[in-house]
Amino acid sequence: MKRQGGYVPARGDAVWITLDPQAGHEQTGRRPALVLSPATYNGRVGLALLCPITSQVKGYPFEVALPNGLAIAGVALADQVKSLDWRARKASRICAVPEDVIVQVLRRLNVLLAGTA
């Protein structure tokens, strides 16, 4: 999504964003991430809910594979959701991710939040 001041991340966007500082097993550095929160929230609040994308596929149950043919490859890590200031961390759009990927990520996240299987 674009607005008068420039790009605002929208749900379903894959973006480059800086994840530092990090601790423990968290992803670090300037990395791709998947935006889960809607552009209306992101633009108004200046934060976005994102999950990192990695090319290191391990077969972990909370990984959601990105389809072939996108400008980015790998898996979204649904259990590593972060709320980040996308302006301060210089988010830039890579591409749009298909809706079915977003649905899969949200379902896996729901397992953690609601305790459902």
What are these regions (language model features)?
Residues 1-117:
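Conserved functional hotspots at enzyme active or ligand-binding sites that engage polyanionic ligands
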